[in-house]
Amino acid sequence: MLIIETLPLLRQQIRRLRMEGKRVALVPTMGNLHDGHMKLVDEAKARADVVVVSIFVNPMQFDRPEDLARYPRTLQEDCEKLNKRKVDLVFAPSVKEIYPNGTETHTYVDVPGLSTMLEGASRPGHFRGVSTIVSKLFNLVQPDIACFGEKDFQQLALIRKMVADMGFDIEIVGVPIMRAKDGLALSSRNGYLTAEQRKIAPGLYKVLSSIADKLQAGERDLDEIIAIAGQELNEKGFRSDDIQIRDADTLLEISENSKRAVILVAAWLGDARLIDNKIVELA
């Protein structure tokens, strides 16, 4: 497994792979890898000749400096996991390598609408940072496919739109959420939970599933469903942050023409902001 930290070396390797006619898959990450990331890697390996994993804690997508400062950096352990998975290339650049003149004056990519609604409304600049770094990685790695987790549902929708709008010739693969046995969606932020909070955490998925059951049973008073769910989260020990029920294909409000709904839940548990989602077919 090759570990590359600079743009010239990365470009050199990508040129070689292109000359050899290899099909390249990219898995963009911020490191602190867990089994959910490994599922992305496995999906990439099944679809390509060469797998490139990027590890970069992107300062442009953090709306709170304290979150950026405390985000776990575990490059050595991450590389050991990826080596066992037989990943071909790890791109782990420094912030200086990606943003040589800082982030304030760096050219950015913005996806109107999707970047400022829902999660974007409560995290200003977050999705602009995501679309900027992902487009830069696409430009550098020139992958045939790129794999993203469905846990970050809005992020995946944003990247699909960016790819369509910008004409990137890249297949975007959404990989289903990987869960612990008790239902908790795997996330790097789970590491912020205390042992006691970890016991409470699966309650998020239980509330999510309860909303899904109500929708499947034909209930359509969304305001009431959301209000009850928020109350249930707070009673379980969470601080409910945001609960949305949207059209899964547009992320707009549910309408009579909506065929699928996506339930998007965000809640604080101690210092961890946990997110999860579930898609429901509407009868």
Curated annotation (Swiss-Prot):
InterPro entries: Cyt_trans-like, Pantoate_ligase, Pantoate_ligase_C, Rossmann-like_a/b/a_fold. The active site is at residue 37. One of its GO terms (molecular function) is ATP binding. GO terms for cellular component: cytosol. Pfam families: Pantoate_ligase. It is found in: Cytoplasm. It catalyses: (R)-pantoate + beta-alanine + ATP = (R)-pantothenate + AMP + diphosphate + H(+). Pathway: Cofactor biosynthesis; (R)-pantothenate biosynthesis; (R)-pantothenate from (R)-pantoate and beta-alanine: step 1/1. Its main location: cytoplasm. (R)-pantoate binds at residues 61, 155. The reaction proceeds by a bi uni uni bi ping pong mechanism. Its EC number is 6.3.2.1. Beta-alanine binds at residue 61. CDD domains: PanC. Homodimer. This is Pantothenate synthetase. ATP binds at residues 30-37, 149-152, 186-189. It comes from the Bacteria. Keywords: ATP-binding, Cytoplasm, Ligase, Nucleotide-binding, Pantothenate biosynthesis. It comes from Escherichia coli (strain SMS-3-5 / SECEC). GO terms for biological process: pantothenate biosynthetic process. Catalyzes the condensation of pantoate with beta-alanine in an ATP-dependent reaction via a pantoyl-adenylate intermediate. It is an enzyme of class 6 (ligase). Belongs to the pantothenate synthetase family.
